[in-house]
Amino acid sequence: MQPQGAIFVALPHLGPILVSLLTRHRMIRWYDIPKKPPWCPPHKVLLAGWITIYFVMGYASYLVWKDLGGGFGRPLALPLGLYAVQLAVSWAVLIFFFAAHAHGLALLHMLLLYGLVVSTALIWHPINKLAAVLLLPYLAWLTVTASIAYHLWRDSLCPNHHQPLPMGEKRD
């Protein structure tokens, strides 16, 4: 890997590092809430998942950059421009989810992000098939995190929906 590869691999981590530094105390307290869905992974697993995803997508972007000749010419505008947009949306999700605790807004941005990642993979596929395939775990991880965001958003709207009703009663 060329030295530029290290930059591409490190770049996706800048947003999460900055968000973490600015919101560390709120993130730790948030993760201790008892109403997380049962499938929500422990904090360390969630953190390791995101670190891995960011490394992989950084490497994938490097492959695309390298296969299009390096530099920052016109052929890179769409493939890396779209990647930059989805990276920015990904960082915004962190702010909405962890700092603002706006789970509905985070969920909407995750759905937008899902579409952006699929679009990025489709554009990258003719350039570098491995780069496109490397985005698939990101889509899987987004599915998990979006389901957590949905669960938390739903619970914030209807906090008692998960409590059992007495025998014979139905919810409205």
UniProtKB/Swiss-Prot annotation:
GO terms for cellular component: endoplasmic reticulum membrane; mitochondrial outer membrane; plasma membrane. It is found in: Endoplasmic reticulum membrane; Cell membrane. The keyword Transcription does not apply. Keywords: Cell membrane, Disease variant, Endoplasmic reticulum, Membrane, Receptor, Transmembrane, Transmembrane helix, Transport. Expressed in erythrocytes (at protein level). The chain crosses the membrane at residues 3-23, 45-65, 80-100, 104-124, 130-150. Coiled coil: none annotated. One of its GO terms (molecular function) is cholesterol binding. It comes from the Eukaryota. GO terms for biological process: 5-aminolevulinic acid import across plasma membrane; enucleate erythrocyte differentiation; import across plasma membrane; intracellular cholesterol transport; lipid droplet organization. Gene3D superfamilies: TspO/MBR protein. Belongs to the TspO/BZRP family. It is linked to Defects in TSPO2 functioning alter the cation composition of canine erythrocytes so that they are high in potassium and low in sodium (HK phenotype). Although HK erythrocytes have a tendency to hemolyze they do not cause serious disease, but the phenotype may lead to misdiagnosis of hyperkalemia in HK canines and blood transfusions using HK blood may induce hyperkalemia. This phenotype has been identified in the Shiba breed. This is Translocator protein 2. The lineage of its organism: Eukaryota, Metazoa, Chordata, Craniata, Vertebrata.
